[in-house]
Amino acid sequence: VIRPILLLVALSFPVFAQTTQEKVREYRRANEWPLLREYFELLSLPNVASDNQNIRRNAARIMEMMKQRGLDPRLLEADTPNTPPAVYAEWKTPGAQRTLLFYAHYDGQPTDPKQWTRTLPWEPVFRTAAIEAGGQIVSDAGPPVSTPINPQWRIYARSASDDKAGVMAILSAFAALKAKGIALNSNIKFFFEGEEEAGSPHLTEIIKKHKDLLAADTWIICDGPVHQSGRKQVVFGARGDTNVDVKVYAAKRPLHSGHYGNWSPNPAMMLARLLASMKDEEGRVTIDGWYSDVEPLGEAELRAIADAPKYDEELKKQLGLKRVEGGGKSLMELINVPSLNINGFGSGDIGALARNVIPTTASAVLDLRLVKGNDHNRQTQRLVDYIKKQGYHVIDREPTDAERAQYPLIARVNVRPGGYNAERTRMDLPISVAVIEAVQSTAPDKIVLLPTSGGSLPLSIITENLRTVTISVPIANYDNNQHAENENIRLQNLWDGIETFAALMTIK
């Protein structure tokens, strides 16, 4: 008599099967400390692309992480000596009709350790919150395993967000799916680059050399932050980028500013005037043709911009800005036009080393961000032509005495190697829709769709050489200080990233 009653009671209540997201979250919660210990080990390795010995230590460590997850990794080398290798692995799914390749990069920006607050770039620590919000170091020696993990804690270290977080989230998502026995619907490939922050100068070489291995229907890119509102976002393009060094000249030796001021030209003034003339008061670039070849946004892209959260006023408050550029356009709109930025400017000395002299030279590094339709070679040529129109004799080396005697204004202009164009994928493609649905399934709020990221990635190199499409799914907190001192990742963003990539690996 008891059994039928129990059966009836059981049938009277709904039975809920765990979703993929719930299973992945269960795995993560059970393995938080092992995952974090593994991540701290990776973050403790210096990872500037020019440091070949340490960059290869990073690659070796990532290979070990892959092996522990049942993958068979290998290094993809370029033919150029001392090039940082890419780390590659794949997982074949029987019967799969689609191949997804997950991209992140393991190198980081150079940094000055003296600029970090109480910590060093490659000595990761937990803080209770962002430094700007009064976050305190949990323990200089690292918290004990018994300490409850607060998802609002942040890990401070170089590349904690950009972009070792991508490596960690992707590999942890794969581990969770495998541990929980969740079937994949696609062949999965992993590609972790080692010199993205150096401009990916050898990515084309690596891709061409290993073209068959890197073939995929879609490259899913993990790099960059979520929207400033905190919502998850899917980004369908990235700006191109190229960097240019500009140097102008005055007297051949430093001159006493009292004896020679008002007579000898000051190169700092010369360069300041030249650079200031390149933009108007609203920040619009005045160089001829700068915007002429921009490819217009389509209806879907314009709708996505209109639907995105309006966050400019809040950003102005956070950043202490009363006035911004752009002539009244939103940040989201301005990301989709080419820009010209001064990365750095130098002439003479300041601070304790300041002297009453007229310097001999002044130098600046310019950052040209490109959008779909721009060509990086054409854009840099426009810059050179503009400098010539301002009366400068342009060369690509140090001037000779004869040139100094002949030309009153001389500018050395050098375009740095590794420039690349912008790329953008249509938002209405079937794979685009599938990615949007997968990411949305893991988010409590409506996700943000961006036609183009403000940051740059070498997506055009990928699409041009492999005839594939790229879609970016960033996971880092927007206030992560990427490229700057005190870089950090909020733990909840890392945890959310694991669930997001698990959803992408199981799209139908």
Spans of model-derived segments:
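Short, conserved micro-motifs enriched in small and acidic residues
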Residues: 3, 153-168, 261, 265, ...
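Sec-dependent N-terminal signal peptides
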Residues: 4-13
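Acidic/His- and Gly-rich active-site-bordering loop/insert found
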Residues: 18-160, 180-184
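An extended, acidic, His-containing surface patch that forms the Zn2+-binding/catalytic region
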Residues: 95, 228-229, 291-353, 374-385, ...
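Acidic/histidine-rich catalytic neighborhood of metal-dependent amide-processing enzymes
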Residues: 147-237, 310
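Short amphipathic alpha-helical face segments that pack within enzyme cores
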Residues: 165-176, 270-273, 434, 461, ...
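Short glycine/serine- and small hydrophobic-enriched flexible loop segments
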Residues: 172-179, 273-277, 368, 503-506
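Midchain, well-structured core segments that form catalytic/ion-binding scaffolds
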Residues: 204, 212-388
